[in-house]
């Protein structure tokens, strides 16, 4: 057995035994023929690598059986020799792969380019490399991520399939531990650019809707600066309720509003004055809401500046009368007519209104109240700008109702002003306050005579035709103004 072991070792380990193997093969073939059973015995050990012991110890039958095995083993050895000296291998034959596809994505390390089985995740920047590269990079003393050059606080070890990498934008490659976190990152970092685009259009949409309020705010802003009064509350009132109403009046008042703005700048303009009057009316109403009487006094100068233009559109005497009249009365007149009148009627009525309103201030406050509360009117001069919003809100209905002639006392032409509410809003005491404010507002309004009945008739006749012609309802309103004014004159006087 020892001899066999040596043979085995020799055949496996030494090349010299290879020659012996070759010699042994020859007798094996002879043995297979079974010509001489005795001769092969000595050669058998040569030809047999591991089986010689069996052949020697076993019977001939066993030897034959073993011989076949030797043959097989010999073939194996021959293949073994080929393995030792490999030749060209051909892979052009088909291979059928059995198994299921693994949906887990495989990422490649940006450092070594090999597929990552264990991730090394850079914590602050969330970029990943294979764990070996990440650790090696850290050992080098570099605390910067090799991908983004951001400082690295620590490195996390993650298993393949536990990370979700962002591939929406090339070069992002941030990784997250859940699909939800990845989606949140995409929405925040990559989809945000698109969302702003949608938002800007929305913003523009809102501005168009709010333009009427914007216009009113501009007017309000101008007077508030001058008056330093609490115009913000009136503006708020105007902004909140008026927008819908403003839209309606704007259709009629679009031009008047535009005119109103210029008139304040250009007091001499005749057409603008009526519209400024409407502004004054609005201001008064705003004051009414704010219940600030003292503030209007500061605004008187502003209101006066704007109010004088309204008389210009009215007949010439209206202007002088207005100058004589206190500014307060003029604003009052303007306030009720504009509120009751639709945007179109305001220009002519403002002229007549100043006439009517002064008498109202003196005699019957209820008349003025119909359109705007007199107390706000007295203090209205400063808040005049904010009231336009409220007045506009009221005006739209009045604009629709301009035809009614019964309220001529306020606007003469537009009977809407005739409504009883104005008296309630107006306070006789507030009228005198307006007269005081009138002096501050402007020279034309400073005159106390503004209250005189004479002023009323003058604006009724001449101003209505020019202004009223623009708005169809104004011309008829002018006529009613005179009779209504006559009725109210005794009260105001």
Swiss-Prot record:
Among InterPro entries, the record links this protein to: HAKAI-like_RING-HC (IPR040380), HAKAI/CBLL2 (IPR040383), Znf_Hakai (IPR041042), Znf_RING (IPR001841), Znf_RING/FYVE/PHD (IPR013083), Znf_RING_CS (IPR017907)
Q: In which pathway does it act?
A: Protein modification; protein ubiquitination
EC number(s) for this protein?
2.3.2.27
Q: Which GO terms describe its cellular component?
A: cytoplasm; nuclear speck; nucleus; RNA N6-methyladenosine methyltransferase complex
Pro residues: which segments have biased composition? 262-276, 342-352, 372-389, 399-412, 459-469
Q: Which reaction does it catalyse?
A: S-ubiquitinyl-[E2 ubiquitin-conjugating enzyme]-L-cysteine + [acceptor protein]-L-lysine = [E2 ubiquitin-conjugating enzyme]-L-cysteine + N(6)-ubiquitinyl-[acceptor protein]-L-lysine
Task: Specify the residue ranges making up the C2H2-type zinc fingers.
Answer: 164-190
Localized where? Answer: Nucleus speckle; Nucleus, Nucleoplasm
Q: What does this protein do?
A: E3 ubiquitin-protein ligase that mediates ubiquitination of several tyrosine-phosphorylated Src substrates. Associated component of the WMM complex, a complex that mediates N6-methyladenosine (m6A) methylation of RNAs, a modification that plays a role in the efficiency of mRNA splicing and RNA processing.
Q: What is this protein called?
A: E3 ubiquitin-protein ligase Hakai
